[in-house]
Amino acid sequence: MNRKNVTRTITAIAVVVLLGWSFFYFSDDTRGYKPVDTSVAITQINGDNVKSAQIDDREQQLRLILKKGNNETDGSEKVITKYPTGYAVDLFNALSAKNAKVSTVVNQGSILGELLVYVLPLLLLVGLFVMFSRMQGGARMGFGFGKSRAKQLSKDMPKTTFADVAGVDEAVEELYEIKDFLQNPSRYQALGAKIPKGVLLYGPPGTGKTLLARAVAGEAGVPFFTISGSDFVEMFVGVGASRVRDLFEQAKQNSPCIIFVDEIDAVGRQRGAGLGGGHDEREQTLNQLLVEMDGFGDRAGVILIAATNRPDILDPALLRPGRFDRQIPVSNPDLAGRRAVLRVHSKGKPMAADADLDGLAKRTVGMTGADLANVINEAALLTARENGTVITGPALEEAVDRVIGGPRRKGRIISEQEKKITAYHEGGHTLAAWAMPDIEPIYKVTILARGRTGGHAVAVPEEDKGLRTRSEMIAQLVFAMGGRAAEELVFREPTTGAVSDIEQATKIARSMVTEFGMSSKLGAVKYGSEHGDPFLGRTMGTQPDYSHEVAREIDEEVRKLIEAAHTEAWEILTEYRDVLDTLAGELLEKETLHRPELESIFADVEKRPRLTMFDDFGGRIPSDKPPIKTPGELAIERGEPWPQPVPEPAFKAAIAQATQAAEAARSDAGQTGHGANGSPAGTHRSGDRQYGSTQPDYGAPAGWHAPGWPPRSSHRPSYSGEPAPTYPGQPYPTGQADPGSDESSAEQDDEVSRTKPAHG
C-alpha cells in the first residue's frame, strides 16, 4: 500500500468521524443548559426561583429556567439535572405548587439515531480492518487471501536488458530465443516449432539467475509476472493451490505473457511420505502447479521461467519436458566471463590507469557475478572513504581481500611472538607450494588479520580448470600441511592456527579415496551414498553402504595421504630453511608480499619430483607412448598464432547450408514460372484430391519418379470447361514427358529403367 493510498484512507476516516461528531453535536438540544446537582435544582424549586420547567420523562432529566441566576448556578438562568426513577410526579407536584409553568416531554427514539449509534463504530472498525489488511498486502488476512500475490512489472519500472548481463552467454542465448519467439513468431511457426512452455534456471547463488529473468522482462515486450515460491504456501489450508490457479488465470487473461517464479524449490520440492505427521499442503500446491503447467487445461502463450539453487530436490514430474522444456545451467563465469562482468560493473565508474581488470579477472577464480559486482562496489566505497576520485589497483586488491576474508582487524593487538608464528606459518604454506610441480603459483601472502584468519596465502591458477589430476590434489595437500610443518620445524610444537588447513586437507584426502577412486588399495569405487528423504534435505539421511573393515581401510588411506603430504612439506622446509627464514623476515617487515617479491626470494628453490607412492595401478602398467598433441600445441611449435577462432557447431553449418539450398531451389522454381511448390501458379484445383495434390516423394535421388505416377490424363475424371489438372511437386528431369501428356505407360517404364539407379 503506497503513501498516496494511506493518505487517502486516513482522510476518508477523518471525514466520517467529523460528520458523526457534527451530527451528535447539532442534534443535542440541551446546549445552553448548565448541568447542576439534583440538590441544587430542588433548592431552586423550594426557593420559588423557577420560572418554567420541562420534565423529559424518557431521559429522566429536568430542565429549569430560573427567574434569576445565583451563586449555586454560577449565574446561569438555565440549568439541567437528572432525577431518580419514579420521582417525576413529585417534581411535577412541587413545581405546580410554586405556580411554575411545567411541561412534560416523552421523546420517541429515532431509528436513524439508533442506527448511527451502533453502525458508525462498526463502520469505523471495518474501515480500520480493511486499511491494515491492505497495508499488509491484502493476502495474509482479510478478504482475498486465496488471490495470487504475483506482481506485474509496469513500463515505469527501471528496465534490465541483456546488455546488462555478462558471463553467462549460453543462458542469454537460450533466453534470447524465447524473447525473439514472442516478438517474431512467424519465423519459428514456419518450421512448425513450438515455444518452450517452461525454462528452469539453476546454479549456485549469485550467478545471475534472477538478473536473467529481469533481462527477459525488460526485453520481452509482453506482460511479465513475478512471484516467489514462498508466496504460495502460508498458514491457511488450500491457499497455495488457490493462488496457483489464480496466477495462471491472471496470466491467461494477459496472454502472451511470462511468469517468473523465484526459488521454486520452496513449492516444487520432491513429494514424499509426509514424515512428521504434517499436512500435505505443499504437495497439494505442487500438484496444482503440475496441472496448470501441463494438464487438460489450455495455457497457450504462457511461458513459465523458474530459478532455483537446488535442482536436485525438485520433483521429477516438475522437470519433465512439457513443463520445463529447457533446463539452463547458470554456473560461475570463466575467465572471459569474469572480464565481461567486471567491464559491465565498472562502466560509469572512474578507473585509474593501474586498475587492471584483466589481471583482476585472473585472480578471482571461482567468484560469481555477484561477488565480482561486490568487489567493484567495495573498491568504490573504499575510494570514497579515503576521499579519492578514481578507483585504483590497490583499492581493487583490498576489495578482493575484503570480499574473500572480510574486513581487516585493525584494532586487534597481536604480540610479537604470535606475529612471528603467523609469519612462519604462512611462509611454510608459500614455500611448500612454490616447490611443488603441480600447483598454481602463489600470487600473494600476507600476515594481516582478516575475519577469522590471522593471515593467508593466495594461489591463483593461470587458467580455468574443470579437471584435477591426482598429482595436483596431492600438491594441494602439501600446500595445506606446509603451515603445520613450519610450526613444528621452527617452534617444536604445533598451534591451533592450522585447524582450517587440517580440515581442508582431510576433505581433499577423503574425496580422493571415497569419491574419485584414486586409491589403488580400495579401487575405483565410490563409497557412501545418500539415501535421505527429500524432506530431510537428502544429505541428513546419508548412510554408509560399506563394511566396518572398508571404513577402517578408508581411514587408513586418508591418514596415509595426509602423512605423506605432511612429510613432503617437512622435507621441503628443512631443505630450504634459510629461504623460509628470509621469507618470514620479509613478512614481518612488509606484512604483505606479491609475486615479483616472492620470485626474487625463491630464486634458488627448485621444483620437487612428484610423489609416486600412490601411482600404483594394481598390475595395470601404463603405456610409455605419449599422448598426441593438440592443434594448439602443434601451432605453437610451428610458431603460428593461437588460439584460432572457435568454429561454429556442425549443426549450425548444416542448417545454414540446407537453408541456402532451399532458397536457391525456390528461386529457380520462381524463374521457371512455378509456384512455391513447383507448380504453375493458380492451377491447384479441388478435383485433384482424388489422386492427391502432390507428387509422392520416397526419398529417392533427384530426377527419379515413381512408375506410373502421375496417372494418365485419360484415366482422370473430366470436367467440362476445365483444363486438365496439374500436380505440383518435385520438378521433373529435363526431357521427361509432361505428366499430363498422352505418353504411354510403357514409354514411362522405359524412362524409369534408364533413370533408376541399380540396387544390389
From Swiss-Prot:
User: How does the protein associate with the membrane?
Assistant: Multi-pass membrane protein
Enzyme Commission code(s) on record: 3.4.24.-
Keyword Membrane part of the UniProt annotation: yes
Listed binding positions for Zn(2+) are H425, H429, D501
* Regions of this protein lying in the Cytoplasmic compartment: 1-5, 132-760
Where is the segment annotated Disordered?
616-760
What sections of the protein cross the membrane? 6-26, 111-131
Per the record, where are the segments of Low complexity compositional bias?
650-669
Q: Which residues lie on this side of the membrane: Extracellular?
A: 27-110
Annotated binding of ATP, by residue: G203, P204, P205, G206, T207, G208, K209, T210
Which BP terms does GO give this entry?
A: protein catabolic process; proteolysis; regulation of gene expression; response to oxidative stress
**Where is this chain's protein located in or outside the cell?**
Cell membrane
Cofactor, how bound (note):
Binds 1 zinc ion per subunit.
Protein keywords: ATP-binding, Cell membrane, Hydrolase, Membrane, Metal-binding, Metalloprotease, Nucleotide-binding, Protease, Transmembrane, Transmembrane helix, Zinc
* Pfam families cross-referenced by the UniProt entry: AAA (PF00004), AAA_lid_3 (PF17862), FtsH_ext (PF06480), Peptidase_M41 (PF01434)
Which cofactors, by name? Answer: Zn(2+)
Molecular-function GO term, any one: ATP binding
> Which residues participate directly in catalysis?
E426
What family does this belong to? In the central section; belongs to the AAA ATPase family.
Q: What does this protein do?
A: Acts as a processive, ATP-dependent zinc metallopeptidase for both cytoplasmic and membrane proteins. Plays a role in the quality control of integral membrane proteins. Complements an E.coli null mutation. Upon overexpression in E.coli has been shown to degrade endogenous sigma-32, SecY and phage lambda cII protein.
User: NCBIfam families, alphabetically?
Assistant: FtsH_fam
The subunit structure is:
Homohexamer.
Protein's name according to its UniProt entry: ATP-dependent zinc metalloprotease FtsH
